Structures are given as structure tokens and as C-alpha cells.
């Protein structure tokens, strides 16, 4: 998908799990203003579909992808509060001229991104970002972390210029201003929990 103003280009290679019909292929257009690319599965999409249907939303597919778009239309950025599953997604809201995305609560699905001026790139694999950016530099901090702990903690990656969206975070990228803002929509709640009993 390429927007009329050439500001947004979305691509997707789909592994069909729920709705195998080509009508559910991605990038998926919910209407003329809402488009989505989505990696994962929403486990409670049938319950959401029923709830949204009672609010007047209609559906042309049996996919969880379409339900996510309707949830965004109804709840805006709060839609992630209703999703139970593993996911990384980006919604292009043409009317508001923004990209809205999120990563699931436990970070099961990966989400890498690169920002350079007004250039915002994202992918589920870091190699996809590498294809278009040949001057990425290796992060010594990330090498040290990997050699010490066997992992590179979010939001860092092996490259200085590429970051991971943290688990349980959502973001908004404003296409007009080029501003990128992320925030947690979920975190573990330890309040009132006795973690140590001695």
C-alpha cells in the first residue's frame, strides 16, 4: 500500500492462521482511512467482534485483523486494552495523518523501528530494516549485554540506530510533524503482592 501523498508505504508477508481467504491479506484496508499491518493473533477476537457488532460495526471477513480495525475506530488508542493475544501492529490513520502501533504485553511478537529525521521504518525482523540502511553501526553496549546476559534488553538492538518497541508499549508517529511518542499501556501490577514469604 502506498498513500496518495507518498508519505506512507506499507508492506506485509502474511502467514494466514484464522481467515485463509485472500480478502484478509495485508496491508488490510478497513475503509478508505484505516489500514493495518499486523503480525500475530488476537485470541478474543470473536468476543470483540460480537461486542463491536452490537455497537453497529459490520464485518466482511472472518479475520481478527478486521476486528482490530473496528476496535481502533471505536476505542482509539485504548483499543490495545481490549486485545488478548500476541501481536505487533501498525495502523495507518489517513484522516488523522498518523501511524498508531503497539506490541503485545509480554513481547511475544517482535517490533523493530528506525527513525532518521522524517524517515520512520518498522519491521518484525531487523534484517528488513538493514536492507534499506547500509550504514548501521554495531552497539558495543549491546554486545556487552549479550555476552554478559545472553540477551539484549529492550529497547536496544545490536545496532545503535535500530530500537525495539518495548513489550506492553504503544506509539504514535505524527506524519505531519515527524514526532514519535511511545508510552506503556500495560505493566505488571505488584501492588498488594507479597513477593517474599520468609
PLM region descriptions:
Residues 1-198:
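Cysteine-centered catalytic environments shared across enzyme families
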Amino acid at each position: 500500500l502506498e498513500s496518495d501523498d507518498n508519505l506512507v508505504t506499507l508492506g506485509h508477508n502474511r502467514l494466514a492462521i484464522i481467515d485463509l481467504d485472500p480478502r484478509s491479506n495485508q496491508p488490510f484496508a478497513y475503509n478508505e482511512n484505516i489500514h493495518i499491518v499486523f503480525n500475530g493473533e488476537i485470541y478474543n477476537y470473536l468476543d470483540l467482534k460480537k461486542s463491536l457488532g452490537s455497537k453497529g460495526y459490520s464485518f466482511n471477513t472472518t479475520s481478527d485483523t478486521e476486528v482490530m480495525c473496528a476496535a481502533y475506530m471505536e476505542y482509539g488508542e485504548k483499543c490495545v486494552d481490549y486485545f488478548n493475544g500476541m501481536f505487533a501492529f501498525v495502523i495507518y490513520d489517513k484522516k488523522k495523518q498518523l501511524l498508531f502501533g503497539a506490541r503485545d504485553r509480554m513481547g511475544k511478537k517482535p517490533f523493530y523501528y528506525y527513525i532518521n529525521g522524517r524517515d520512520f521504518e518498522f519491521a518484525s525482523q531487523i534484517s528488513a530494516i538493514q536492507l534499506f540502511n547500509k550504514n548501521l553501526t554495531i552497539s558495543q553496549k549491546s554486545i556487552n549485554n549479550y555476552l554478559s546476559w545472553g540477551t539484549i534488553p529492550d529497547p536496544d538492538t545490536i545496532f545503535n540506530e535500530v530500537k525495539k518497541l518495548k513489550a506492553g508499549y504503544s506509539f504514535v508517529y505524527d506524519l505531519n510533524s515527524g514526532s514519535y511518542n511511545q508510552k506503556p499501556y500495560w505493566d505488571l501490577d505488584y501492588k498488594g503482592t507479597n513477593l517474599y514469604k520468609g
